[in-house]
């Protein structure tokens, strides 16, 4: 406390409070920090608000008043087309102010992006310089201000471009390219030398003379090769060769190579004798079946209508070639440090599988990654690696054969596997790599999806399925419902007694046929409930016990091209197929669907989830393979019937060479059935129901269709939004009107973002 005496009567008392020096400094610093933060927040919010207002002014001028209009005009005058980027840049800077609290340090990438923008605006303005510059810069500025065209660089770019053009002339491109290169270097944050070195690493240089280190490596590899050959001669290796023709015989050693105890299995003569016996038994069984049913006049076609495979058996030279390829494969793997040996070679119709047994400690992934190197050393177009082979502790390397051998349908039908199958819906697929005939049962699938590129073998596979059913089942046991939007594929089967109705070729009628199938499925389930049975087998057992009047046949629904149906009526087709796939199994109805376009808009999630069994032929990409099989591999197939079969319950797909049947064989079998059977009687009630559904759908025209047609002819525009605005209707109704106009041929189909073409005029009306 301090007392100050001014005179005898007046005294001033001052009380001074002393603070420690460090506390006083901290208080001042905190005040400054809070003040700086507040200022940066105010600045950031102001800049962001200004940028947001500028953005609204650019896109919604009517909402921002006089200031917004003036700002839009000013921005277009100053920076031209860059006016659309300017508000975004301002809002970005405002956000940075708020986050960084006013301490903004922009990176080189930010400056690089800005140089690209400025350089682009200058380049745009340079292209239009002759429109604005006539020798007087001010006149050009006035023209830019008064111009209604916004596609220019603005006054700033104009002022910069005029001296550049006067100094450099047409050589201004060099300057702009230089600025682009500099900006790209700033954005990439790499030097030009680094970029050049990275590109040089990707392109190996040709070396005319090997270096000393390379010479040592080559000598070392040659020594290793000699050691491997000596080791191979010492080790007694057992390589089992399995030919799909099942030939027996021993192979002589080739030029002193000591491959001891090579087990070669051959049973061609035995198989030929067995096939003759089985064929005779099959024909006897067919005769008994047709004679036991007195009411049926169906006569099964004989095996002689099908072509016989006359392919020669595997020669000794071919076996020597297989052994040589097995040695090359082992040497290739050894050169990459993979210790493995070939334990079996299986020669299939289209590919040969080498079964490898890797040593302990060798990773499977290491062998998979060497697929390209294996194909190079074996001079193959490509290899497929199956790791591991299901049921074996081995890795399969599938190499395409030089000469493809066809598998004829007669071979599989005469096989013991087909004749012993008791199912009515068993059909022949082909042969696997080991030469075993593959016969599958449609009742266990219970539905099948077939996909593949054009010419890969889908139609042949469907023909083998149908012909197999004709050899296996009478019309009272199995009925067929065929849908063929391509018209020419399945029409040959018209007239056989197995068909419920003639082959459906109209896509709209196809939707009606599927609708009938759904209704039939519902009727069968009601029938099962009335008789206390769960499925078609239980109901037919009641028929054998004379407890019901009629027997229910199995129904196989075959769709040859799903993509065409999905284009015409996708919603209905997807719903019907989804319901059938979910519920039709117990009712004795099975789907076989084929498509050559395995995209997700054709094979939808609903269809894919309810059809677990799939066959994939050769496809063009790995994406298509994953769409069909949920795994890759189909893109490496060879075509011509080479397929991957993934039945329900199997963890991995099986590679099969599909059975082949040509058009002449199909016509012979179908012609025999037509001639020997009674006249086919189609279900008229099904045909009437389908036709009524089609006529009903065609008669559902919108009442505003004619008015919409007049509008698009007068305006010369055809769009859903136009009809929606003019007629004041909802989007769904306007879209349906557009679909009806397209169906009637008044407008063209939709082609991406391009406008539809109007195909009629006033005279046509």
Curated annotation (Swiss-Prot):
Residues 188-765 are cytoplasmic. The chain crosses the membrane at residues 47-67, 75-95, 110-130, 167-187. One of its GO terms (biological process) is chromosome segregation. It is a multi-pass membrane protein. Signal peptide: none annotated. Residues 435-626 form the FtsK domain. SMART domains: Ftsk_gamma. GO terms for molecular function: ATP binding; DNA binding. Pfam families: FtsK_alpha, FtsK_gamma, FtsK_SpoIIIE. It is found in: Cell membrane. The keyword Membrane applies. GO terms for cellular component: plasma membrane. Keywords: ATP-binding, Cell cycle, Cell division, Cell membrane, Chromosome partition, DNA-binding, Membrane, Nucleotide-binding, Transmembrane, Transmembrane helix. ATP binds at residues 455-460. Its main location: membrane. Consists of an N-terminal domain, which is sufficient for the localization to the septal ring and is required for cell division, followed by a linker domain, and a C-terminal domain, which forms the translocation motor involved in chromosome segregation. The C-terminal domain can be further subdivided into alpha, beta and gamma subdomains. The alpha and beta subdomains form the DNA pump, and the gamma subdomain is a regulatory subdomain. Homohexamer. Forms a ring that surrounds DNA. Essential cell division protein that coordinates cell division and chromosome segregation. The N-terminus is involved in assembly of the cell-division machinery. The C-terminus functions as a DNA motor that moves dsDNA in an ATP-dependent manner towards the dif recombination site, which is located within the replication terminus region. Required for activation of the Xer recombinase, allowing activation of chromosome unlinking by recombination. PANTHER family: DNA TRANSLOCASE FTSK (PTHR22683:SF41), SPORULATION PROTEIN RELATED (PTHR22683). Belongs to the FtsK/SpoIIIE/SftA family. This is DNA translocase FtsK. The lineage of its organism: Bacteria, Bacillati, Bacillota, Clostridia, Eubacteriales. The gene is ftsK.
């Amino acid at each position: 406390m301090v007392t100050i005496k001014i005179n005898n009567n007046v005294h001033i008392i001052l009380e001074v409070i002393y603070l420690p020096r460090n506390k006083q400094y901290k208080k001042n610093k905190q005040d400054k920090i809070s003040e700086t933060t507040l200022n940066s927040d105010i600045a950031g919010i102001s800049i962001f608000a200004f940028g947001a207002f500028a953005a609204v002014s650019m896109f919604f001028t009517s909402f921002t008043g006089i200031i917004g209009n003036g700002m839009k005009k000013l921005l277009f005058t100053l920076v031209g087309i860059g006016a659309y980027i300017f508000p975004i840049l301002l809002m970005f800077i405002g956000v940075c102010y708020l986050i960084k609290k006013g301490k903004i340090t922009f990176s080189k990438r930010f400056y690089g992006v800005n140089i690209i923008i400025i350089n682009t605006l200058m380049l745009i303005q340079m292209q239009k310089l002759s429109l604005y510059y006539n020798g007087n810069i001010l006149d050009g500025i006035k023209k830019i201000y008064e111009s209604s065209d916004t596609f220019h660089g603005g006054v700033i770019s104009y002022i910069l471009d005029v001296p550049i053009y006067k100094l450099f002339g047409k050589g201004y491109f060099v300057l702009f390219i230089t600025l682009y290169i500099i900006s790209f270097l700033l954005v990439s944050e790499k030097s030009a030398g680094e970029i050049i070195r990275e590109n040089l690493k990707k392109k190996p240089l040709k070396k005319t003379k090997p270096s000393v280190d390379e010479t040592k490596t080559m000598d070392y590899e040659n020594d290793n090769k000699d050691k491997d050959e000596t080791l191979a001669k010492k080790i007694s290796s057992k390589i089992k060769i399995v030919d799909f023709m099942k030939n027996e015989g021993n192979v002589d050693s080739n030029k002193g190579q000591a491959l001891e105890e090579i087990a070669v299995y051959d049973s061609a003569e035995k198989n030929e004798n067995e096939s003759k016996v089985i064929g005779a038994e099959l024909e006897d069984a067919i005769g008994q079946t047709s004679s036991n049913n007195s009411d049926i006049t169906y006569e099964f076609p004989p095996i002689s209508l099908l072509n016989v495979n006359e392919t020669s058996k595997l020669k000794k030279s071919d076996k020597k070639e297989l052994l040589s390829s097995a040695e090359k494969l082992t040497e290739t793997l050894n050169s990459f440090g993979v210790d493995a040996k070939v334990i079996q070679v299986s020669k299939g119709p289209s590919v040969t599988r080498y079964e490898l047994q890797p040593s302990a400690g060798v990773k499977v992934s290491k062998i998979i990654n060497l697929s390209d190197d294996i194909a190079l050393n074996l001079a193959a177009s490509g290899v497929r690696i199956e790791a591991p082979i299901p049921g074996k502790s081995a890795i399969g390397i599938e190499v395409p054969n030089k000469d493809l051998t066809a598998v004829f349908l007669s071979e599989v039908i005469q096989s013991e596997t087909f004749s012993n199958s008791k199912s009515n819906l068993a059909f022949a697929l082909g042969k696997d790599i080991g030469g075993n005939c593959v016969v599958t049962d449609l009742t266990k699938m219970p539905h099948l999806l077939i996909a593949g590129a054009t010419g890969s073998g889908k139609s042949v596979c469907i023909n083998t399925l149908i012909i197999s059913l004709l050899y296996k089942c009478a019309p009272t046991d199995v009925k067929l419902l065929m849908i063929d939007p391509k018209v020419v594929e399945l029409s040959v089967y018209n007239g056989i007694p197995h068909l419920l109705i003639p082959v459906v070729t109209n896509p709209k009628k196809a939707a009606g046929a599927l609708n009938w199938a759904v209704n039939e499925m519902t009727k069968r389930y009601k029938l099962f409930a009335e008789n206390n049975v769960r499925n078609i087998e239980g109901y037919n057992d009641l028929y054998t016990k004379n407890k019901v009047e009629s027997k229910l046949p199995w129904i196989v629904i075959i769709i040859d091209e799903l993509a065409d149906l999905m284009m015409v009526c996708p919603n209905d087709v997807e719903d019907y197929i989804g319901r059938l796939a979910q519920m039709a199994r117990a009712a004795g109805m099975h789907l076989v669907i084929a498509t050559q376009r395995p995209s997700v808009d054709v094979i939808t999630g609903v269809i894919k989830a309810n059809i677990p069994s799939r066959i994939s032929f050769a496809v063009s990409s790995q994406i298509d393979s994953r769409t069909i099989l949920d795994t890759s591999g189909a893109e490496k197939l060879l075509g011509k019937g080479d397929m991957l079969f993934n039945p329900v319950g199997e963890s991995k797909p099986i590679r099969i060479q599909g059975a082949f049947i040509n058009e002449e064989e199909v016509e012979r079998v179908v012609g025999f059935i037509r001639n020997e059977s009674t006249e086919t009687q189609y279900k008229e009630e099904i045909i009437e129901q389908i036709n009524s559904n089609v006529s009903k759908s065609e008669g559902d025209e919108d009442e505003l269709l004619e008015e919409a047609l007049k509008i698009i002819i007068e305006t010369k525009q055809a769009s859903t939004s136009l009809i929606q605005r003019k007629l004041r209707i909802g989007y769904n109704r306007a879209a349906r009107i557009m679909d009806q106009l397209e169906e009637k041929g008044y407008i063209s189909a939709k082609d991406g973002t391009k406008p539809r073409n109007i195909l009629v005029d006033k005279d046509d009306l």
